[in-house]
Amino acid sequence: MIKARFKKRLLGSRGAFDLNINLEIKEAEVVALLGESGAGKSTILRILAGLEAVDSGYIEVNHSVWLDTQKKIFLKPQQRKIGFVFQDYTLFPHLNVYQNIAFAHPKDKNKIHKVLGLMRLENLSQQKILKLSGGQAQRVALARALIAAKNLLLLDEPLNALDNALKNEVQQGLLDFIKRENLSVLLVSHNPNEITKLAQTSLFLNNGVIDPNQENLPFLNCLLIKPLFEDENYCHYEVIPQTISLPKDCLNPTFKLDFS
């Protein structure tokens, strides 16, 4: 169980605002954190990882206190044993795929090989990072995060470089791993299908706080778009309360919805 309450003053594109967060994540639960760009979602991940300071606050993970500003407690990032997938991956370019994944726990070879298989990286284990595609590098970053995570997994747009077929495989493997390892997960993503597939709970960050009236927000209604089925020529999507059909050669449809 993750319990976090903290405050931090941020400077965004629209000026300064206060981040005032009260968050709980259960074991083996994936929580999606939604919100506009610049709302502070990535900052929250970095605070939980110990990579950014807060003005005041408290973080507890499985009854262990990671942060308490009143008691001047601060657990260093390397002591938190979390997995973190950054948007820029932050891999070691001079190491190969296996060495990057094994960096946190080099002796746990059985787990390393399982994660290599989970991320479809078996045939790339000796490849240097600089020779990988964007999607391959992203899978390496995710695999390394899974090896490192003991309690908490932080995912910042973790699958946005993958094609749809591979993404579906990786998503299911990721869910199985999270359940098996009892990880608490905080996911930041702008992909509605990804959120629907991975997350049990969705929270909306609005004006520096997690909005208590999420069900009334137009942004969340975008999650009601989901693929239904395909036939010979068309892909069919459900957009509550109606169904629309698009030509199958429309590979990445963009929906403009009016909720007024």
Regions found by a protein language model. Give the residues of each.
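Hydrophobic anchor residue at the start of the ABC signature
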Residues: 142
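A short, proline-enriched helix->beta-strand linker immediately N-terminal to the Walker B motif
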Residues: 147-151
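Conserved ABC ATPase signature
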Residues: 128-132, 136-138
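Conserved H-loop
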Residues: 182-188
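ABC ATPase NBD coupling module
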Residues: 66-84
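Conserved ABC ATPase "signature" region
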Residues: 64-69, 109-125, 176
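Catalytic Walker B motif of ABC-type/P-loop ATPase nucleotide-binding domains
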Residues: 153-157
